[in-house]
């Protein structure tokens, strides 16, 4: 029999069966379904799948027609904002329908992943073995990581980044004074911008300061105490990852665990199809004999195929013509006639752009330059440049820099020589890859998609201009010589310590810049302008596309109604933000009020325990009443002699938490005792209700002065439980549970009370120990050297963290294993359950199967409003069932064909 129904009530004295939010079966089921649908969509994306247009359209239409908030509760401004958002969604739906009507984007992405680039292999051509190339790649990656680490951990580089941020905030605040005064940095920070950091210093993990003969570790900290840490010379897979619980594992282990979950889930389907592959291969052998006949009769009317063949044919014609007349018809970049033609074409393209637009762009660019020059004067720019050079010089003095940079430059020169050796072979190899249907389809599809978004404007002119620049570089010996000189200069800058600060370095850089202008601003300027003009024409068409214009207008209107008034000035809208506070936020809290836990398992040497279909309600678990009292007393004297003999301050703090409740229904449990007496197993359903005032906790702390071994004492911890109801049903021992229920209720209350008190005593004791050590360390550092207090705290917390990890590891060895199950392969005891047919965990596994089912890139998991979704029905999706049936048919055909194949082989 279930526990009596609870009712929702929020008051100072709620009824005995009242909770903050009574559990609603329909709402719980709705929350579970929505979260499982989201889980399925995420799993499908992880599996490399994408939603089709129908699935995208159905979700957008549903979002447009179903507002998550009651519009009548919103202000007029709030309703306008909702309509703006709906207009944006409708425009996105139209873009998907018109620009991607044949699902070109999904097919292009799929094709790009399934192109066979192995056809580019040229055996016997490359004078470096595969093993040597792999080893060089690993060594290069290690050296690059070392160089990046040296620059990122250098004190001067870190201060430069900080100073750039301060200057950027100041510029932003100046450009938008009314809107961003709060973002402006203080004058003290601005004054420190031009100051240099300590020389020859690198910052390692936990802020440790290192010298030029030490290699710093990289440490990246995340929220909740998570962090990643690794040595730059190590393989990235050996990087140490620490989660929010303090558990440490390598990046390789984390990646392998994720891959194992994916591969194991697919293994069953692969086993079913393995026997069918042999049967399919025999059919392929027969089909290949007819392949050439079929290829000659291919339908040329399919739009994408026809376009692909036209593009390929044009490319082949252009290649043949170029090869036949290579020595006679190559355009001479020095010929004045060719340059005049290019300039004329560029001028014609520029004339297409309205003078008003060109003038507006020029004015905007000039204003931006003037503004930056005012905010960043030449003196500050020179100082920043000098400090950047200083970073390079300091890194050049580090022992790891010379080794890494020398190896990289030498290896680059080595492979550059190999590249010349295989240049001609590489052309053939690239053509082989381009002829692969998947690669060719992907290239054409992406290009077609871009042209559709530019209102049908072709990209042919852009690629022609780009090809012309490539031809210029290939045919100009002077330009190649300039690049050689530039390469020599970069070698000296990167390898010779201090050369970057020498006047010869600046002089040679100016000479290279001046000589380069002859190529980039004079000789090939017309070709560059042609490319830029073609790009500008195409981007103009992109910006004038009706749907792109409509989407931009929708977003502008949404931002205007959200942030600006009718005059276009940034303004605060109190009614709109009241809607956010009073309507939107409560709605969001309701959406996350239930936290479903499909399956949790615990196992040790004495018991296996499984909890399924557990729902935690946030509003119930959070205390409804929080009461804080604080008593503070201070005493002092104007005479130092008296101050030394008196307690200067005393504090007392009291915290009361009340109405911590729970309304947990229909939780499935199963357990199996493996030792002790009696050895039994059972499964069933349980209800647990903490109602009324629920759990109340009252704690009082008092400070203790003039003692180095403690900071505060705990005067008392009172815990009280008001209403506790529980019920167990559908088990094998219902009679036993009913018999002991009345006695067990009191025992459970006392056990919960004692557990909460002991846990709080232990937690407060640990807090007192930590505060004592922090206070004592800071006092010692303050007496010795003012500048070491921060470092003392860092060292202290580093040791505390290591100690906590050791204690946790020791605790894990003594206790059992607890897991919240997220996939079927992580279950400790998969056979231990109450009712597998109704389990949320089993339903989640079927959602995962649906996410990995579908032809090519498709998946039924994206059908979020499909009534046949496994999250709704609890059954396999029809697509999964059909796939299983098809696999079984293929298996039967393979088995039936096996005797015939064997007999034919024997006769041969």
Swiss-Prot record:
Tell me, according to the record, the phenotype of the null mutant: Increases mating efficiency; progeny exhibit increased growth as hyphae. Leads to defective capsule attachment and higher amounts of exopolysaccharide shedding and biofilm production. Does not affect virulence in a G.mellonella model of infection.
What does the UniProt PTM comment say about this protein? Palmitoylated.
Chain intervals with Basic and acidic residues compositional bias: 179-192, 231-247, 261-283, 306-321, 338-359
Task: Give a single Pfam family match.
Answer: HAM1_N
InterPro entries reported for this sequence: HAM1-like_C, HAM1-like_N
Where are the annotated segments for Disordered?
1-24, 177-359
Q: What does its record list under induction? A: Repressed during mating.
Q: Which residues form a coiled coil?
A: 255-282
Q: What does this protein do?
A: May act as a negative regulator of mating during vegetative growth.
Q: What is this protein called?
A: Putative cell signaling protein HAM1
Which gene name belongs to this protein?
A: HAM1
